[in-house]
């Protein structure tokens, strides 16, 4: 842990502390996940600060484990290349961008499905629309993590990676492209409760930021 770059290490620590703090607070009747998770912007529980705080909330152990594993594996490399300030900026912008895309997707869904109703029939019965909208909460660092994956694939496109269950190494750029295509297909064709378009949003904002930095520094190819 002492060998980790500063921002990567602190991101891991903060996320883990928030995760365990969430469960401790629950025992005292405090729902931190609801307070800090990202609500739909038309819901009464929404506030702008949630675009940052939602990144530090996670739904369960597997959720935080895989996100933090990716931060540890790829984030430390990016921080060593970019430095702490640029890496933290990138991480936060990807996470915020993912949240904005999630809000946009939910808004489109709201306009096409819910906007003409005053209440919604759920598993718990019929509830008012405002109460239903407050249930639409997004949590997790996955948007920022997908931005990290994109950046790694752009900075080190030909790095060899072993990905289960593929029996042979693949280049990082193909790994990233494959993940993006998978997220798009899942976003279009599944209803699994995962914010797939938010993941793509993190990658999109990461791409925009990297291209901007490249042009600001004198241009050149996106991949090197």
Residue spans for each PLM region:
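A detector for small-residue-rich transmembrane helices and their helix-helix packing motifs
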Residues: 1-224
